[in-house]
Design a protein with these regions (language model features):
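Extended beta-strand/beta-hairpin segments
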Residues: 1-77, 89-173
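Alpha-helical metal-binding/catalytic segments enriched in His/Glu/Asp
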Residues: 79-83
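Aromatic- and glycine-enriched beta-alpha-beta binding-site module
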Residues: 84, 88
């Protein structure tokens, strides 16, 4: 008997499905990050065993010491990288062939909200635009079907489209 080859992503999805089916508590995952401030507005952020540097451009009080500069660009990077992962996983799940994925994003931010110059202006992006280019043998309709699945399942996109409760606690010695 010949079995169809299983892609690495299919194997990951299947393993997670099986583990979660056996114990639904395994579906709950906690991600962590920890930041330490230094310089004027720069910080070092620990993500597991990795560290990244975050800074702002001089116009926002920073020293331009780390690419990308503003933390909002890290948000764009997070959104795009999550989109790429989600496109790969869902292309595999739906049996849609994708040869290449490129994505770009830009967001409009009015700094009056950040600096508190105008309380009617939100502090974050007013709009984010994402363009994903897919190459491969499938029809446009199949790729639009894939986009619908990605839009419904991309965790970082979900954070933006749906209000996520954030609880902040200030600790002092």
């Amino acid at each position: 008997m010949t079995t169809a080859p299983v892609s690495p992503l299919q194997a990951v999805v299947t393993a997670n499905h099986d583990a979660i089916s056996d114990d639904p508590a395994k579906a709950a995952v906690v991600f962590r990050a920890e930041a330490r401030a230094h310089s004027a507005v720069a910080s070092t952020v620990a993500l597991g065993r990795f560290e990244i540097e975050v800074d702002e451009p001089p116009a926002l009080g920073g020293e331009n010491t780390a690419p990308p500069n503003p933390p909002v660009e890290y948000y764009l990077a997070s959104l795009l990288s999550c989109q790429v992962v989600t496109y790969r996983v869902w292309a595999d799940k739906l049996g849609i062939a994708v040869d290449g994925i490129t994505a770009r994003a830009e967001g409009d931010l009015d700094v009056r909200g950040f600096f508190g110059f105008d309380d009617a202006v939100r502090a974050g992006f007013g709009e984010v635009r994402v363009v994903v280019t897919l190459t491969g043998p499938e029809s446009r309709e199949r790729y639009l079907e894939l986009q619908e699945a990605v839009d419904a399942h991309c965790p970082v996109l979900d954070l933006t489209r749906n209000a996520t409760p954030v609880r902040t606690v200030v600790e002092t010695p």
